[in-house]
Amino acid sequence: MKDAPHELALLAGVVVEWGGTGAQQVGADRFSTITPTFYFGKGFGDLPDSTGWIRAFALTGQVGYSIPTSSSTSSVDPDTGLVSVTPNPRFLVYGTSLQYSMPYLKSNIVDLQLPDFINHLIPIVEAQFTTPVANNFGMPWVTTGTVNPGVIWVGAYFQVGVEAIVPINRASGTGVGVLAQLHLYLDDMFPTTIGKPLFGTAAPPQKPFP
C-alpha cells in the first residue's frame, strides 16, 4: 500500500533462506528458514512548512518472524558416535533506519547553496536486531544486533554507501566492522534491455538528478 500525499508505504512479504546451499563447515544450515515480514516507510515531507528542515527526514523499518522448516538438527560425533540434537530456535527479526535526504532538502525545502557533492548525500543510521522467542532450549535468550551509522551518495545511475557495523553487546560481536555498497540502477542504465521488467510496462525513469 502506498499513500503518496503522506509519503507512507506499507508492504507484506515472505523471505526464504534456502537450506543446503552452502558448506556445513562454515556454518551453513541444512534446513530452510521462512520469515513472514512486514515493512513500512514514512517520509516527513507532509509535515507543515513551519517544521522546516525536519521534513527531509524519513523512517523505515521491518518486523519478521523467522520459522525454521526443521525444529531440530541432529549430528553425530565422529569420535564417539554419539548423536546430539540441537533445537532450531524461532526468532523475532526487526530493524529500522533513520535517514536525512540532502537531495530532498534542496529540491523541496530550501537550497542552501551547498557543494554539489553534499547535495547528493543521505546520512543514515540503520539498526538490525534478532531475538529468540521459541524453541531455544539450552541456549541464552539474548537479543543480538548491530547499529550501523553511515552515509549514501546518490547519483542518476548508481549509489554508493558506506556504514560502520557496531555490535550492541558482546554476544553480537567484539569489534567494529565496515560495510560498503554499490547499487546500480539497471532500469535507468539499460531501459530497453536488461533493465526492462519481465512483465508489464516499464514506468518512466525517475532520476533524482539531471
Where are these regions (language model features)?
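Outer-membrane pore/translocation modules
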Residues: 1-96, 138-141, 190, 210
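Outer membrane beta-barrel transmembrane domains
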Residues: 85-209
